[in-house]
From Swiss-Prot:
It comes from Aspergillus fumigatus (strain ATCC MYA-4609 / CBS 101355 / FGSC A1100 / Af293). Residues 39-64, 353-416 are annotated as: Disordered. InterPro entries: WD40/YVTN_repeat-like_dom_sf, WD40_repeat_dom_sf, WDR55_POC1. Residues 371-383 have a biased composition (Acidic residues). This is WD repeat-containing protein jip5. Disulfide bonds: none annotated. Keywords: Nucleus, Repeat, WD repeat.
Length: 416
């Protein structure tokens, strides 16, 4: 399925990762408060003059991954990132108590939101930022708050207050997954979403608030993703939310039946409990491998679970010591995994007769673009803040498995 990987070294621990919805762009948020945005080579541009596709530069080892921009965005760590639905804006949230909206292409800040403080007046650090639509931004925090902001309200020097605040869980929100819009939707944007927090799952509606909270699952729920197009039958409509737990088990939840899980898949069994399933992503249907989920583990591996048979069919290793924090697929079907101080870009397998001489141990890699930390400009402050800066102190992150990761080159075998 994939057999090539490019490794991008980072200057600090990765705390957040986001993939552009329309272009081959990946952004990372670091423990130092830096945000850096990379552009991956586009295979669409690699065509002959007569329109026939040539061997992609991203496959033959001659492509470049370029740093579009890099800046010190937050005084503390950058805990979360998310692109707007059209990819024009990049939202970041940090332990400095700020959410910043910047142009994805340039990194220039256009808006700021002050996160409401905790009850004791301290910073209520963010856990998730998600643009639900062009009008609505969702922000979750350590105190279990879920704030909803109307992005149509013009920027004001006065700190914007959320239009709504909910508390769907007793603990901080660990994941947020939007549900697809209904058939009667006129906007085409989601108005409901699933969250996990502590040992429960909840569904919240844009207008009606928290609709339902599940029974106590007696296990910490860590990650979630929606998948449709599964085989329908009986009471199943072929739509499920997949939830990753802290003990190595995936639970399957039928859409609309949120009281309790209906199936379990053991991904990582170990004596005394499995490994935490930190992040989930749906493998694109275009890759032709059927319905499949990629699971990023706290142990540094990525496992692939085929739906239907509900079992692990393959595994690759992102890093042998650091957990997988970010996982997703870009617009061209490449898997991007992040954790520790590295980001890896995995490519779909290429037939052996397409391979050229530019290989390393049978695996090709990109040439390095302008992504060296040495190329960082002298002004390391936020684009919108030109005043003096104090040195940022990285703050403790909720997730485990932080630290320096290896920077080796790895490949993996086909998934059939």
């Amino acid at each position: 399925m994939f057999d090539t990987v490019c490794t991008l070294p980072l200057s600090a621990d990765l705390f957040s990762q986001a993939l552009h919805p329309k272009e081959p762009i990946v952004s990372v948020g670091l423990s130092t408060g830096h945000v850096q945005t990379f552009r991956l080579p586009s295979e669409e541009s690699d065509t002959d003059n007569d329109g026939a596709e040539s061997t992609s530069s991203s496959r033959n080892g001659k492509g470049h991954i370029d740093t579009m921009w890099r800046t010190r965005r937050h005084k503390g760590s950058c805990r979360c990132l998310g692109f707007g639905v059209d990819g024009e804006m990049l939202y970041s949230a940090g332990t400095d108590g700020l959410v910043k909206a910047a142009k994805a292409e340039t990194g220039v800040v256009e808006n700021k939101i002050a996160i409401p403080p905790a009850k004791d007046g301290s910073v209520d650090a963010p856990t998730i930022v998600h643009a639900l639509s062009p009008q609505t931004l969702l922000l979750a925090t350590d105190s279990s708050a879920l704030h909803l902001y109307d992005l149509r309200i013009p920027f004001s020097p006065v700190s914007a207050r959320p239009q709504q605040t909910h508390h769907p869980h007793d603990d901080y929100i660990s994941s947020l997954t939007p549900l697809p819009p209904s058939d009667t939707s006129t906007s085409g944007f989601s108005k409901q979403w699933v969250t996990t927090g502590g040992t429960t799952l909840a569904v919240t509606d844009l207008r009606r608030g928290v609709l339902v909270r599940s029974e106590d699952q007696e296990e910490e729920l860590v990650s979630s993703v929606y998948i449709g197009g599964l085989r329908a039958g009986g009471t199943s409509r072929g739509e499920k939310v997949i939830v990753g737990g802290s003990s190595g088990v995936l639970t399957l939840w039928e859409k609309g039946a949120w009281d309790d899980q209906d199936e379990r898949i053991y991904v990582q069994r170990e004596a005394g409990g499995g490994e935490s399933l930190e992040t989930l992503a749906v493998v694109p249907d275009e890759l032709g491998k059927g319905k499949m989920i990629a699971v990023g583990l706290g142990s540094g591996g990525v496992k692939f679970v085929r739906m239907g048979v509900n079992k692990v069919v393959s595994e690759v290793m992102h890093d042998e010591t650091e957990g997988v924090i970010g996982l997703g697929f870009d617009v061209e079907g490449r898997m991007v995994s992040g954790g520790g101080q590295i980001v890896k870009v995995w490519h779909e397998a290429v037939d052996s007769d397409e391979m050229d001489g530019d290989t390393i141990g049978g695996k090709r890699m990109f040439g390095s673009g302008s992504d060296s930390d040495d190329s960082d400009d002298g002004d390391d402050s936020d684009d919108s803040d030109r005043g003096s800066r104090k040195a940022a102190q990285p703050q403790r992150k909720k997730r485990k498995n932080k630290g320096k990761g290896g920077q080796d080159i790895m490949g993996f075998a086909d998934i059939d």
